[in-house]
A protein has these predicted regions:
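Arg/Gly-rich low-complexity intrinsically disordered repeat tracts
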Residues: 141-153, 157-168
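Surface-exposed, charge/polar-rich loops and edge strands
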Residues: 2-140, 167-402
Length: 402
């Protein structure tokens, strides 16, 4: 009888393990219901007054319950000798408003510079952006609507461009081709020789916020980390938004060190996984740089017994992407690394991250570190405790297992 019971328990355990493995590979396994009111529309002030849910990494069978903290408690939670790796990318004013040669108002979102002053961009409305189409940009949405004010418009703003006196300050771009991969357009900007578009975006562009932020009063600088240095992202590495200069100083005083990588966050961050078997998902490419100084700091930290804590999923992708040869190396280029449960970690041991969208590649990445079922259980606790979700929301800290 004892052997029969043991065999039955073994079969049940094996069956449960098989079910969990199947769900790890299934898109449905990463779904959860979030009350809309928990989607943060504005950041907290000060930044480090956000809440912090602290959990231990990966299923050991005796996980301690999550601990509820405030983000400014971080120096008391981490250990001296730990190393925080941060993404120093800077969000560019990548959303521009303009008029086509027909007079129709248009909106574009810059994605990446393919060559000097030639940018891949998403366009809206997208159906009639044919090769050779000219676009005039002037001073954001308000500027483009004021342009031509007083001219009697017909057919929903479709007067020829010649009916509108050109504003004194404007940009011109020409559609070169359609990009099959994104559905966007390659635009060539007509600028004075030696001048780059990035230098002019503060004048003509606006900081793009994620589509789920619909009622924000946040200032542009609140969607930048305090250590942002390298322009190129179209979305912020949001785990870093919780840090203040004072908190960074306090961490240094506790011998909790900091190093930087760069990953320019792209539009793929907001694109859902659409294949039912997540192992078939093709990850978008993003540009990363892992400098040699950061590699040396990581090696020294590990040698001294310190822990490597990534600040955000973008740092995870940068570090792990630079270690795909088996060992972390200085790297500058693109990565399309997709991390999901079963991934063999090479560099990262702990993670600070916000709460992510259902069925997203970011949720799968975090599941690879902590386990999908444990992560969804933690999310349910966070929802019950009224944590704020997504870009302007609260954070969680996943500590390395002992």
């Amino acid at each position: 009888m004892e052997q029969q019971i043991s065999s039955l328990e073994l079969n049940q355990t094996s069956s449960q393990a098989a079910t969990d493995t199947n769900l790890d590979c299934s898109l449905a396994g990463y779904d959860y219901q979030l009350p809309p009111e928990l989607i943060a529309q504005n950041p907290v002030v000060p930044r480090d007054s956000s809440r912090l849910l602290v959990v231990n990494s990966q299923n050991t069978g005796n996980e301690t319950p999550p601990l509820h903290h405030i983000f400014h408690d971080l120096p008391d939670i981490l250990r001296p000798g730990d190393l925080l790796i941060m993404n120093n990318t800077k969000v560019i004013p990548a959303r521009l408003y303009g008029r086509k040669s027909s007079g129709a108002e248009v909106e574009i979102l810059l994605l990446e510079e393919r060559k000097f002053n030639c940018w891949l961009a998403l366009v809206k409305p997208g159906k009639r952006f044919k090769k050779g189409t000219k676009i005039i940009f002037s001073g954001g949405k308000l500027g483009i609507r004021n342009w031509g004010l007083g001219i009697e418009e017909e057919e929903n703003n479709r007067l020829p461009i010649t009916h509108y006196p050109l504003p004194s300050t404007h940009l011109t771009a020409t559609v070169l081709e359609t990009d099959a991969a994104t559905g966007g357009r390659l635009l060539e900007f007509d600028l004075p020789e030696g001048q780059s578009l990035v230098q002019l975006l503060d004048k003509f562009g606006e900081i793009p916020l994620p589509p789920y932020i619909t009622a924000s009063q946040a200032a542009d600088e609140q969607y930048q980390t305090v250590y942002a240095e390298q322009p190129g992202a179209i979305a912020a590495p949001t785990a870093g938004l919780h840090f203040t200069p004072e908190l960074l100083d306090k961490l240094r005083d506790r011998d909790i060190n900091q190093a930087h990588v760069t990953l320019h966050v792209g539009v793929g961050t907001f694109r859902p996984v659409e294949v039912e078997n997540v192992t078939s998902h093709q990850m978008h490419e993003e540009w990363i740089e892992v400098p040699s100084a950061t590699v040396e700091q990581i090696r020294a930290t590990k040698a001294a017994g310190g822990r490597i804590i990534a600040v955000g999923t973008t740092v995870v992708r940068a570090l792990e992407g630079a270690a795909q040869s088996g060992e972390l190396q200085a790297f500058c280029g693109k990565t399309n690394l997709f991390i999901y449960p079963g991934y063999q970690w090479r560099v990262v041991e702990g993670l600070i991250t916000n709460f992510h969208l259902p069925r997203s590649s970011l949720l799968m990445l975090v599941s690879a570190l902590i386990g999908r079922k444990q992560l969804l259980d933690i999310y349910q606790e966070a929802i019950a405790a009224q944590y704020r979700f997504y870009s302007f929301g609260d954070a969680m800290l996943i500590l390395p297992k002992e």
